[in-house]
C-alpha cells in the first residue's frame, strides 16, 4: 500500500481510533478519511485541473490533517503555513507559492463536513506531495518540493528501522507542521494507525500546563528537537513516571549534546534515544543511530548515524571531489529522498542540486566527516568566522563548552560592529546555578576552555541564562541571542 492507502485503511478498519489530539479536540481515522475525501472533491470542483498547490493556514488544529490529505487526494501538493509566523513572512510565502487556494481551519471544517462520492485523483509517485518553506540567505524563503516518492522512501525506512507497533503508538508532535520535523511524527503515526499528540505553542509557553499535558498524553514515541527536550529536563519531575509508556526518543534538527542523552537515559532507563540528521531538502532525515552506552562512551560529539538504504552520503571538498574518511568537508546527500528542487527558483535549484552517480544529489551547506562508517555533523559552513585573521568554527567552541560538567547548554556568537568581528560571546545554561557572580563563573569557564582551545578561540564575554529562547520550530533562537549583544 502507498501512504494514502495506508491512512485510508485505518479509516476503514478502525474508524473510531483517534488519529489526532490537539488540546481538547480529537479527530478519528473515520472522520479523517471522510472529511479529507470531501475536501478533495471540493478542491477538484473549485480549482479544476489547475495543479498549483493548496496553502493551509493554521496551527495544530485537526483541520490541518484534513487539509493536507484533502489536497494530495485531489492531486495537489499542500503548503503548511503556521499562524505563529509574522504576517510579512506569510505574505512572502504566499507570493512565492502562488497557491490555487488558501484554506483556514474554519474553511476546512465547513467544506469537509459536506459528504461526497466524487472519484479521487491523488498525487502520483513523482508528483509534489508537500512544499515547505525554509530560510534563504537573501532573506527570502525558499519552497522545498518533496514528492510522494521522496516521502514514501523516508517513511518505509522509518517503519522498517523503528518497528512501530500498529494501532498502539502515540507520537509526540512538538514541531509546527510548517517545519519538516513534524513530517516524521505525522506520517509515521498515520501510516501505523497511531495517535498524534500535538503540543501547541500555548502549552510550550506555560510549563505547568505542558507537563500536565505530557502526563496525560500516553506518548510512546517522542519526536522533537534536542532544545525542546533540554527545556523539559529542567523540570525535575520530567521522568519515567510522567511518561511511563515512552519507548523511544527521536531527535533531529539540531546537534544532540551527550549530556542530554545521559540525562534522558538516567530518567527514562527503558527508552531508546536516537540521533538523526537530514536537511529539509532530503526529506526530514537521512541518517540515524541509536545512542547506547557504548556510543555515548566512545564518541563526543555524537555521530548522527548511518545513511538509510538507497541513499549515499559523501563528504566533498571545495572543488566537489569526494574526500576519504576522517577528512572534513561539505556533506552531500544523493538518493531517492532528495527533493527535485525549489519552487519557482531554477537558479537556486541549479546551485544546490546536481546528479551524483545517476541519482539526485544535494549540497547541504553542512560540514561533517565520516568515521567508522558513521557521519559526524560539524556545523554549518556559514557558521565559520574570521577573528584577528584566524578562521574559527563556532561549533568547535560550543562542543568544548558542552564537554564541561558545569555547562548544560551553550551557544557561541560573534560580537560585530560595522560587519567586522570584534570578539566572541558565549551564552551558557549552567547545570546548576552557581553562588558566585556571573563574572567569576565566566572567568572560571574561560580558564577551563583555555586548557582545550587556543586563546583566540576563547569567548571574551559569558552571559548566563536559565533557558535559551526558541524559535517556533523548537530550535535555539540564535537571532534573538545575537540581538541582545
Question: What would you call each of these model-derived segments?
Answer:
Residues 1-101, 106-131, 146, 153, ...:
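AMP-binding/adenylate-forming domain of the ANL superfamily
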Residues 1-4, 87, 95, 101-121, ...:
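AMP-dependent adenylate-forming
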Residues 6-9, 31, 38, 42, ...:
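Alpha-helical elements of Rossmann-like donor-binding domains used by nucleotide-donor carbohydrate transfer enzymes
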Residues 14, 46, 96, 148, ...:
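Acidic-histidine catalytic/liganding microenvironments
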Residues 16-18, 52, 142-144, 286, ...:
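Extracytoplasmic/periplasmic beta-strand context in beta-sandwich domains
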Residues 52-53, 170, 330, 425:
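Charged active-site motifs of nucleotide-sugar-dependent glycosyltransferases
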Residues 55-57, 101-103, 223, 250, ...:
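Structural motif
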Residues 63-69, 76-92, 117-322, 330-339, ...:
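Motif- and composition-driven signal specific to adenylation
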Amino acid at each position: 500500500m502507498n501512504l494514502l492507502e495506508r491512512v485510508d485503511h485505518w479509516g476503514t478498519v478502525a474508524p473510531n481510533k483517534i488519529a489526532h489530539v490537539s488540546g481538547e479536540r480529537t479527530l478519528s481515522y473515520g472522520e479523517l478519511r471522510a472529511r479529507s475525501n470531501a475536501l478533495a472533491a471540493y478542491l477538484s470542483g473549485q480549482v479544476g485541473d489547475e495543479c498549483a498547490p493548496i496553502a493551509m493556514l493554521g496551527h495544530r488544529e485537526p483541520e490541518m490533517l484534513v487539509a493536507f490529505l484533502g489536497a494530495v487526494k485531489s492531486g495537489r501538493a499542500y503548503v503548511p503555513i503556521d499562524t505563529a509566523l509574522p504576517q510579512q513572512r506569510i505574505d512572502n510565502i504566499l507570493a512565492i507559492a502562488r497557491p490555487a487556494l488558501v484554506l483556514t481551519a474554519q474553511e476546512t471544517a465547513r467544506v469537509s463536513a459536506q459528504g461526497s462520492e466524487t472519484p479521487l485523483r491523488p498525487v502520483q509517485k513523482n508528483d509534489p506531495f508537500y512544499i515547505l518553506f525554509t530560510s534563504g540567505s537573501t532573506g527570502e524563503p525558499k519552497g522545498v518540493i518533496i514528492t510522494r516518492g521522496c516521502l514514501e522512501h523516508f517513511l518505509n525506512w522509518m517503519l522498517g528501522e523503528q518497528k512501530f507497533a500498529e494501532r498502539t503508538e502515540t507520537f509526540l508532535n512538538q514541531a509546527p507542521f510548517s517545519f519538516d520535523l513534524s513530517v516524521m511524527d505525522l506520517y509515521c503515526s498515520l501510516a501505523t494507525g497511531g495517535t498524534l499528540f500535538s503540543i501547541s505553542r500555548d502549552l510550550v509557553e506555560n510549563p505547568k500546563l505542558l507537563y500536565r499535558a505530557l502526563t496525560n498524553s500516553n506518548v510512546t514515541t517522542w519526536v522533537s528537537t534536542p532544545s525542546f527536550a533540554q527545556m523539559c529536563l529542567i523540570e525535575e519531575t520530567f521522568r519515567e513516571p510522567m511518561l511511563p509508556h515512552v519507548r523511544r526518543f527521536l531527535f533531529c534538527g539540531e546537534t544532540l549534546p551527550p549530556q542530554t542523552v545521559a540525562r534522558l537515559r538516567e530518567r527514562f532507563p527503558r527508552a531508546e534515544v536516537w540521533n538523526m540528521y537530514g536537511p529539509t531538502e532530503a526529506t526530514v532525515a537521512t541518517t540515524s543511530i541509536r545512542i547506547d552506552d557504548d556510543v555515548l562512551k566512545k564518541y563526543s560529539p555524537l555521530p548522527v548515524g548511518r545513511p538509510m538504504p538507497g541513499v549515499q552520503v559523501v563528504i566533498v571538498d571545495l572543488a566537489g571531489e569526494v574526500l576519504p574518511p576522517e577528512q572534513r568537508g561539505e556533506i552531500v546527500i544523493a538518493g531517492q529522498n532528495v527533493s527535485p528542487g525549489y519552487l519557482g527558483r531554477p537558479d537556486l535549484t541549479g546551485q544546490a542540486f546536481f546528479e551524483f552517480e545517476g541519482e539526485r544529489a544535494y549540497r547541504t551547506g553542512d560540514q561533517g566527516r565520516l568515521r567508522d562508517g558513521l557521519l559526524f555533523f560539524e556545523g554549518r559552513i556559514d557558521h565559520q568566522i574570521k577573528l584577528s585573521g584566524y578562521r574559527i568554527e563556532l561549533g568547535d567552541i560550543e562542543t568544548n563548552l558542552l564537554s564541561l560538567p558545569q555547562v548544560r547548554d551553550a551557544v557561541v556568537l560573534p560580537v560585530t560592529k560595522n560587519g567586522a568581528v570584534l570578539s566572541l560571546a558565549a551564552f551558557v545554561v549552567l547545570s546548576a546555578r552557581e553562588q558566585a557572580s556571573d563574572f567569576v563563573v565566566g572567568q572560571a569557564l574561560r580558564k577551563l576552555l583555555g586548557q582545550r582551545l587556543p586563546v583566540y578561540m576563547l569567548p571574551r564575554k559569558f552571559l548566563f541564562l536559565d533557558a535559551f529562547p526558541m524559535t517556533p520550530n523548537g530550535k535555539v533562537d540564535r537571532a534573538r541571542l545575537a540581538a541582545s549583544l
